[in-house]
Amino acid sequence: MATNAKPVYQRILLKLSGEALQGAEGFGIDASVLDRMAQEVKELVELGIQVGVVIGGGNLFRGAGLAQAGMNRVVGDHMGMLATVMNGLAMRDALHRAYVNARLMSAIPLNGVCDNYSWAEAISLLRNNRVVIFSAGTGNPFFTTDSAACLRGIEIEADVVLKATKVDGVYSADPVKNPDATLYEHITYQDVLERELKVMDLAAFTLARDHGLPIRVFNMNKPGALRRVVMGENEGTLISK
């Protein structure tokens, strides 16, 4: 596909997993990865794209393991929400150091640390070309940050949810286990459900489907991939009707 002269999206919701921030470390936040992501987001802002970001917390805290050990799931999820706030603070700082105006909002009140989530305020900031980082998931236990990404994407009327992963897109099977797995360029919501492809959890995915919110899965570790996605190039997998 020929590169478009201007971006194909006006407003996006970028979903970053917590693991994406840990780089090769295996835990925590890799400063060089954080700075690279901030630079890639900066490129989008310079193209005139309005950017909302949802970050996971898996690099700092994983509630599932502790839940198996007997910890209350609600407590574990609250800890996970706080992990996403920590990642959000790091991302906001990286963006500020890259001279990008960014605002961090949390679904749970953390006065003095970041702003409370406000739909109207978020829309206003996006229109003024501020990057808005949404943290603490949906603010409710039992909902993943993928659900938060789809929910915020729908609320801010994003053109697409861009799910940044460690793989090149959605495959017919696990490419690690099956070398013959094929990469889809485009697939419908229905096909994803029928083939039980692991794109995101069912609650998040059906929310996007019911509201006609397209999802594009791509590899954030490929330099320039995010820019190629917004310029309409064939990068990753597009999931839509």
Swiss-Prot record:
Q: Which UniProt keywords apply?
A: Allosteric enzyme, ATP-binding, Cytoplasm, Kinase, Nucleotide-binding, Pyrimidine biosynthesis, Transferase
Q: Which residues hold ATP?
A: 15-18, 58, 62, 165, 171, 174
Q: Which GO terms describe its biological process?
A: 'de novo' CTP biosynthetic process; UDP biosynthetic process
Where does it live in the cell?
Answer: Cytoplasm
GO MF terms held by the record:
ATP binding; UMP kinase activity
How is activity regulated here? Allosterically activated by GTP. Inhibited by UTP.
What EC number is given for this enzyme?
Answer: 2.7.4.22
Task: Return the annotated region ranges for Involved in allosteric activation by GTP.
Answer: 23-28
Give the matching CDD domains: AAK_UMPK-PyrH-Ec
Which sites bind UMP? Answer: 57, 77, 138-145
Pfam families hit by this protein: AA_kinase (PF00696)
**Which pathway does this chain act in?**
Pyrimidine metabolism; CTP biosynthesis via de novo pathway; UDP from UMP (UMPK route): step 1/1
Signal peptide positions on this chain: none
Query: Which transformation does this protein catalyse, written as a reaction?
Result: UMP + ATP = UDP + ADP
Domain of life of the organism in this record? Bacteria
Q: What class of enzyme is it?
A: transferase
A single Gene Ontology CC term: cytosol
Annotated family: Belongs to the UMP kinase family.
What does the function comment of this entry state?
Answer: Catalyzes the reversible phosphorylation of UMP to UDP.
Subunit structure, per the record?
Homohexamer.
The identity of this protein, by name, is Uridylate kinase
